[in-house]
C-alpha cells in the first residue's frame, strides 16, 4: 500500500534577522516513517523543527500536515492536529513533580480528567521509572529520566507525529542507547517521527 504523506515541507525559507538560516528546504514525512535530519550543529535543523511546529515564522514556502497549512496555524492548534515537539535540552518543569509535568502535557488540549489519567497510565507503562518517581520534582531527575519525561509529556497529546530535537544531546552513550530504544518503541506504536540528531550513527540505525 502506498504510504500517505503526513507532513510536507516545500521550498521553506527562514530568516533570523538578516541571516538566511533555512534555504529552500523540502522534505516529506510519510505516515509511519522515522525521518532523520542530520547535519553539523547550527545547520538550521532546530529552526526547521521550530518553523514546522509554529514557534518560528517562515519567510516563504509551505508546511502542510494532512492538508492543514501549518504556517498559518497557531502553535496550540498544531498540537491538536496531532503534532508534538520534544525540544532539545530536555525542557521539563523542574519545580513540578513528574506527574504534574505529564498533566501539563495533556492540559493544553484536554480537560477530560479520566482521559488524562488513562494517558498518564500509558506513559507509566512505557516508562516504569517515571512511575517510581512520579512524586519527585522533575529538576531532581537524571538527564536520561528528564528526557524520558519530555518524551512522555509529548505523548500525552496522543500525537500522530513526534518532532524530536537532539534527543541524545549531553547524555552518556548508555543513555543514548536507551533513548533510541524508546524512540523505536514509540515508533512501533504507530507514531511517525521526525528527528534532528547529531549522533549520525545512532540516528541512521533507526531511520527509514
Residue ranges and their predicted role:
Residues 53:
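Helix-to-loop junction immediately C-terminal to a conserved catalytic motif
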Residues 96, 141, 154-155:
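ABC ATPase signature
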Residues 156-160:
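A short, proline-enriched helix->beta-strand linker immediately N-terminal to the Walker B motif
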Residues 38-40:
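The feature captures the beta-strand-to-loop junction immediately N-terminal to the Walker
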Residues 137-141, 145:
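Conserved ABC ATPase signature
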Residues 17, 35, 73, 98-118, ...:
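ABC-type ATPase nucleotide-binding domains, specifically the catalytic core motifs of the NBD
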Amino acid at each position: 500500500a502506498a504510504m500517505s504523506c503526513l507532513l510536507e515541507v516545500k521550498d521553506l525559507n527562514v530568516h533570523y534577522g538578516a541571516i538566511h538560516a533555512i534555504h529552500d528546504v523540502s522534505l516529506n514525512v510519510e505516515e509511519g516513517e522515522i525521518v532523520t535530519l542530520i547535519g553539523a550543529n547550527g545547520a538550521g535543523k532546530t529552526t526547521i523543527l521550530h518553523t514546522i511546529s509554529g514557534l518560528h515564522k517562515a519567510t516563504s514556502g509551505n508546511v502542510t500536515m494532512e492538508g492543514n497549512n501549518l504556517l498559518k496555524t497557531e502553535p496550540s492548534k498544531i498540537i491538536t492536529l496531532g503534532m508534538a515537539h520534544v525540544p532539545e535540552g530536555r525542557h521539563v518543569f523542574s519545580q513540578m513533580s513528574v506527574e504534574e509535568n505529564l498533566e501539563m502535557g495533556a492540559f493544553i488540549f484536554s480537560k477530560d480528567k479520566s482521559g488524562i489519567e488513562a494517558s498518564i497510565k500509558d506513559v507509566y507503562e512505557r516508562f516504569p521509572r517515571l512511575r517510581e518517581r512520579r512524586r519527585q520534582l522533575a529538576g531532581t531527575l537524571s538527564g536520561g529520566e528528564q528526557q524520558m519525561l519530555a518524551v512522555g509529556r509529548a505523548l500525552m497529546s496522543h500525537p500522530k507525529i513526534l518532532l524530536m530535537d537532539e534527543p541524545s544531546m549531553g547524555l552518556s552513550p548508555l543513555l543514548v542507547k536507551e533513548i533510541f530504544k524508546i524512540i523505536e518503541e514509540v515508533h512501533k506504536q504507530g507514531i511517525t517521527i521526525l528527528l534532528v540528531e547529531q549522533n549520525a550513527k545512532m540516528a541512521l540505525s533507526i531511520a527509514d
